Amino acid sequence: MHAIGLMSGTSLDGVDAAVIETDGERVFGTGRSATLFYEDGLRARLRALLDAAPGLAPDDPELLSLDWLLADRHAEAVAMVASRADVVGFHGQTILHDPDRRRTWQIGDAAHLAHKTRLPVVHDFRSADVAAGGQGAPLAPLFHAALAEALEKPLLVVNIGGVANITWLGPTGEVLACDTGPGNGPLDDWVRLHTGAAFDADGALAAAGRVDQARLTRLMDDPWFARPAPKSLDRLQFSARVAAATEGLSAADGAALLVAFTAAAIAAAPLPAPPRRVLVAGGGRHNAAIMDALRRHFAAPVEPVEAVGWDGDALEAQCFGFLAVRALRGLPLSLPETTGVPAPLAGGRIVRPGPAAE
């Protein structure tokens, strides 16, 4: 089947769209990909909604407005990769993720998206897992396993978006996955606050700073890091701790500390065996300071996923195209080893377009 996957991450920068050909078990090919960047006003509205999400009512007028608007933006992203497609995999925009209270909330009107694209839309990928006691994240490991079938193991795939997560793939088919801690999220927020830029381009600001090891130790001294995998977190989970640890630092030293925090948290993830290779996806792979920090932690080569021919900018969107096909076939989206769900579990909900308007 040909699927179009859509992913809008917690960095709130836009929506990625990508075409993938798959049966939900193997990847036969990939097609066009594109990113539709959100305008500044939409990013600001989403950031405010994310901050308000714990107390938000489902009928909140701003929520309903953004629910519709996000579907419009995602339909525009589909048009950017316009291709023969059988289904759309629509992750939606996460505004709340609290699996310990069995809550996860992704917004975006899937029915409106189905109407706009005239395609079946699979959405709500995480709720079934969370309701069953799983962490609801990460969901990429089965896709990573399909892509990496021919690669040497053990292999570690690291995705650094707003949150960082890993997939560890063993030599006899073992899979382990979890969120590791903050990704680009705290660093982006820091850079925006102190320089006005959207992110630390090439890691230049962090590279100019010095890491205060005592502050880094305090950041890593959080009970969450002692929890066994699988585990997941919300983008804002460490906000108070980060604010306290960075207080009084220069822009460069704060950026350096947050880069070190991201890398140290990834390296602290409990792995069954050391990887022979570390492949990095997500926006973090463009940050030279993060990549250098990871190389100091791992004995294995640390490379962007492009080193094995994967498209790091399209990978997450491709993943949700892959998962959409799995959902259509009733195949599991999560495993005990990836989200902590008690048994392999299917998920996602399907919305089909109604009759076209006259």
Curated annotation (Swiss-Prot):
It catalyses: 1,6-anhydro-N-acetyl-beta-muramate + ATP + H2O = N-acetyl-D-muramate 6-phosphate + ADP + H(+). GO terms for molecular function: ATP binding; kinase activity; phosphotransferase activity, alcohol group as acceptor. It holds the Pfam family AnmK. SUPFAM superfamilies: Actin-like ATPase domain. The keyword Transferase applies. It comes from the Bacteria. Its EC number is 2.7.1.170. GO terms for biological process: 1,6-anhydro-N-acetyl-beta-muramic acid catabolic process; amino sugar metabolic process; peptidoglycan turnover. It is an enzyme of class 2 (transferase). Pathway: Amino-sugar metabolism; 1,6-anhydro-N-acetylmuramate degradation; Cell wall biogenesis; peptidoglycan recycling. Keywords: ATP-binding, Carbohydrate metabolism, Kinase, Nucleotide-binding, Transferase. InterPro entries: Anhydro_N_Ac-Mur_kinase, ATPase_NBD. ATP binds at residues 9-16. Catalyzes the specific phosphorylation of 1,6-anhydro-N-acetylmuramic acid (anhMurNAc) with the simultaneous cleavage of the 1,6-anhydro ring, generating MurNAc-6-P. Is required for the utilization of anhMurNAc either imported from the medium or derived from its own cell wall murein, and thus plays a role in cell wall recycling. PANTHER family: ANHYDRO-N-ACETYLMURAMIC ACID KINASE. HAMAP family: AnhMurNAc_kinase. Belongs to the anhydro-N-acetylmuramic acid kinase family. This is Anhydro-N-acetylmuramic acid kinase. The lineage of its organism: Bacteria, Pseudomonadati, Pseudomonadota, Alphaproteobacteria, Acetobacterales.
